[in-house]
Amino acid sequence: MRVLLTGAAGSIGRVVTVGLADRGHQIIGLDRVVEPEGFEGPWHSVDCADPDAVASVFEAESPDAVVHLAGKPDEGSLPESLTSHVLTTAALLDAMVEHDVQRIVYASSNHAVGRTPRPPDSSTQIGDDVRPRPDTFYGVSKVAAEAVLSLYADRYGLDAVSCRIGSFLPQPETARHLSTWLSHDDCVRMIEAALTAAAPGYAVLYGISANTRRWWDLEPGRRLGYEPADDAEEFADSVPARSEDEFEAAHVGGPFAGEEFYRPALDRP
């Protein structure tokens, strides 16, 4: 499969590029920066928020599917966040419709539901039917991008999978990560499952590993063929206790739900 991968120079993008290539997919890299050393394949230094530039990439490369990982990975003003996550998604979707590309896999975030209280115990997990409860403008933009994906799936019959990524790290570093961790290998498994699942329409899954202490339900991903193999519990003994642990576990978005991230929606001179 020829996969257009946005944000290909980012931390997730580099891992997914190698993982999908190892599984036989051809990666077309797209990012605002120059081609990273060692990348093999076509590369386009393009801003996904520029619809004409995005359309030109589709015209040149004829991808079979899109993996959209691009976007500012932290908090900003509301306009900055909407541009980074919603307008980029819309530009890609318009190009997909124009060039008859059927499938997109989107890197959404746990922060789309980050103000959701932590489940009371391990027998209760948060499903894909929970209402949006963003914890930041970053989370708001992920909710809005998911809504645009849902619209295009309904309007044009696209297949769109939103992966609400937890904590993508080589290994868990805090107590919260024991619930939210997504290993590098499981991330690749998740993306490939979302790319190859039979006609999912619009779907949401939680991008986490098979963590013993997980807060989110893995069943939505399993319905699409995502079978995580790693468990943060393997590292539990090496994770130090911290004074912030109790606060970070109050809501599933962790520190993003705290007052540290409260700010006006709009920047003023």
Regions found by a protein language model. Name each.
Residues V3-R23:
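N-terminal Rossmann NAD(P)H-binding glycine-rich loop of SDR-like oxidoreductase domains
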Residues S109, E146-P170:
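Conserved beta-loop-beta element that borders a ligand/cofactor-binding pocket
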Residues E75, A107-S123, F137, V143, ...:
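Conserved catalytic-site region of short-chain dehydrogenase/reductase
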Residues I165-Q171, W181-Y202, A210:
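Alpha-helical substrate-binding/gating segment
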Residues A91-P132:
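Conserved Rossmann-fold NAD(P)-dependent oxidoreductase catalytic core, especially the SDR/UDP-sugar
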Residues V46-H85:
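NAD(P)H-binding glycine-rich loop region in Rossmannoid oxidoreductase-like domains
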Residues A49, A65, E80-A91, H99, ...:
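Glycine-rich NAD(P)-binding loop of the Rossmann-fold in SDR/ketoreductase-type enzymes
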